[in-house]
Amino acid sequence: MKNIVLIGFMGTGKTSVGKLVAKKLGFDFVDVDEVIEKATGMEISEIFSKFGESRFRDIEEEMIKLITPKKRQVIATGGGVVLRDENMKRLKKDGVIFCLRASENVIFERLKQTTNRPLLQVENPEERIKELLQKRMPLYEKADFCIDTEGLTPEEVAEKIIKEYERLSNGKT
């Protein structure tokens, strides 16, 4: 069985939806950011502040190399995983990629209370969301399937993913 890989901007529901999908299918749930934190002994925000985004992306790429060969996993990636083509090639080789989407406004509303998002620790987080989304959207669109999460519960999004995955699998994954 191929892995189910969730990509998308922060605040689109990758972790909450991923846990539901994994539970319903009996797959393991893997949050790439959690794997990074466990491997480094540091929070993501600490890695960003001490070493910068580039070093974080190097670590992320290494963790993806370790994670992807295993089967029957739901993998929730960080929002910037798409910035490195090598990550997407690996994830696609061993998985079906689902992009979770939401509008800038919805993302801002979902994230405005959080303090653990290093890329949003700026003077104007709304503008930063818009800027990052514009840069990443063409990369997110390379997913096998895109699901708009606005107005849907995590359970409804999970059901859409499972339905599409099972249709696609049909004994092949």
Swiss-Prot record:
Q: Where in the cell is it found?
A: Cytoplasm
Binding positions (ATP):
11-16, 117
Q: Which GO terms describe its biological process?
A: amino acid biosynthetic process; aromatic amino acid family biosynthetic process; chorismate biosynthetic process
- Keyword field: Amino-acid biosynthesis, Aromatic amino acid biosynthesis, ATP-binding, Cytoplasm, Kinase, Magnesium, Metal-binding, Nucleotide-binding, Transferase
Which PROSITE patterns does the entry mention?
A: SHIKIMATE_KINASE
Enumerate the residues binding substrate.
Answer: 33, 57, 79, 136
What does the entry's cofactor note say about binding and number?
A: Binds 1 Mg(2+) ion per subunit.
Q: Name one GO molecular function term.
A: shikimate kinase activity
Q: Which cofactor does it need?
A: Mg(2+)
**Listed InterPro entries:** P-loop_NTPase (IPR027417), Shikimate/glucono_kinase (IPR031322), Shikimate_kinase/TSH1 (IPR000623), Shikimate_kinase_CS (IPR023000)
The GO cellular component terms are: cytosol
User: Which reaction does this enzyme catalyse, per its entry?
Assistant: shikimate + ATP = 3-phosphoshikimate + ADP + H(+)
Which residues of this UniProt protein bind Mg(2+)? 15
Q: What Pfam families does this protein map onto?
A: SKI
The pathway where this protein functions is: Metabolic intermediate biosynthesis; chorismate biosynthesis; chorismate from D-erythrose 4-phosphate and phosphoenolpyruvate: step 5/7
Please state the protein's primary subcellular location.
cytoplasm
Q: What is its EC number?
A: 2.7.1.71
Per the entry, what this protein does is: Catalyzes the specific phosphorylation of the 3-hydroxyl group of shikimic acid using ATP as a cosubstrate.
What PANTHER family does the record tag this protein with? SHIKIMATE KINASE, SHIKIMATE KINASE 1, CHLOROPLASTIC
Identify its protein family. Answer: Belongs to the shikimate kinase family.
Q: How does it assemble?
A: Monomer.
The identity of this protein, by name, is: Shikimate kinase
* Organism expressing this protein natively: Thermodesulfovibrio yellowstonii (strain ATCC 51303 / DSM 11347 / YP87)
Instruction: Report the gene name.
Output: aroK
